[in-house]
């Protein structure tokens, strides 16, 4: 049957002389694979449309008996090349689409995840964007959508409200506990064997502020670059623990080196 959907291009592979096979994440069907015949022919109207990171409106000839569906038409909605190419933007882009590609299953519709992905890419493709801050926000929302939302307002062990306890005890550090995920008071976490990491209260408050932000624009969270780097390193470790498929891939190491320069 003929169907229309909006999709994010996650990966493109050359196929035969002039075609492409792409992994895409769609609004209606989740992740799927498509073939675009003649997509590498410069005379083809669809040439250039199916590049990683593009958001496109597609027309598909879809058959449930096929693993790879046929794309017959499409129009560009968003591109990382607009307003202009940026190395740091592409480094963040490939981290994001890599996470989605490796942690989702084919043919499982997830509209909240699609909305998160396209909303993040739309913001990423703007000018004057704090790329690292946006990436940290995406990691937190992404892992939360997949069922691993960390507890950031109350102690993950005792359930005690964190802000009053921080003020009363004049704390300078809290624990971030990897499993169960969330912040913990030192007195509650001290005897626990759970994997945990001491972090400054300032970093914990930045994490809470990030969680409360609908979609960061510019430098909406006031933090220096080192703090943002610490944030997304913490969240990367948290995601890697809970999303096994996101662990240890070479391309993540490469873009990490780019971002940390």
Curated annotation (Swiss-Prot):
Recorded superkingdom:
Bacteria
Tell me if Plastid is a UniProt keyword of this record: no
Q: What does it do?
A: Involved in DNA repair and RecF pathway recombination.
The family note in this entry says: Belongs to the RecO family.
Name of the protein in question: DNA repair protein RecO
Q: Name one GO cellular component term.
A: bacterial nucleoid
Which Pfam family, any one, appears in the UniProt record? Answer: RecO_C
Q: Does the keyword DNA repair apply?
A: yes
Keywords, sorted A to Z: DNA damage, DNA recombination, DNA repair
Annotated TM spans: none
Q: Which GO terms describe its biological process?
A: DNA recombination; double-strand break repair
Which SUPFAM superfamilies has this protein been placed in?
A: ArfGap/RecO-like zinc finger, Nucleic acid-binding proteins
């Amino acid at each position: 049957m003929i169907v229309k959907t909006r999709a994010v291009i996650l990966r493109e592979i050359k196929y035969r002389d002039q075609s492409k096979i792409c992994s895409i994440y769609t609004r209606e069907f989740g992740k799927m694979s498509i073939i675009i015949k003649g997509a590498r022919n410069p005379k083809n109207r669809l040439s250039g449309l199916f590049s990683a990171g593009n958001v496109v409106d597609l027309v598909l000839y879809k058959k449930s008996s096929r693993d790879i569906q046929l794309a017959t038409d499409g129009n560009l909605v968003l591109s990382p090349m607009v307003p202009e190419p940026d190395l740091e933007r592409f480094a963040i882009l490939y981290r994001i689409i890599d996470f989605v590609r490796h942690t989702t299953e084919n043919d499982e519709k997830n509209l909240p995840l699609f909305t998160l992905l396209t909303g993040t890419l739309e913001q990423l493709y703007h000018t004057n964007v704090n790329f690292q801050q946006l990436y940290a926000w995406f990691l937190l929302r992404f892992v939360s959508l997949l069922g691993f939302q960390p507890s950031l307002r109350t102690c993950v062990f005792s359930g005690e409200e964190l802000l009053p306890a921080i003020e009363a005890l004049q704390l300078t550090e809290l624990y971030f506990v990897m499993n169960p995920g969330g912040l913990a008071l030192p007195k509650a976490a001290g005897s626990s064997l759970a994997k945990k990491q001491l972090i400054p209260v300032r970093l914990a408050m930045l994490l809470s502020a990030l969680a409360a932000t609908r979609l960061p624009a510019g430098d909406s969270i006031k933090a220096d670059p080192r703090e943002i780097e610490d944030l997304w390193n913490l969240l990367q470790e948290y995601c890697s623990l809970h999303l096994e498929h996101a662990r240890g891939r070479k391309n993540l190491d490469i873009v990490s080196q780019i971002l940390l320069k």
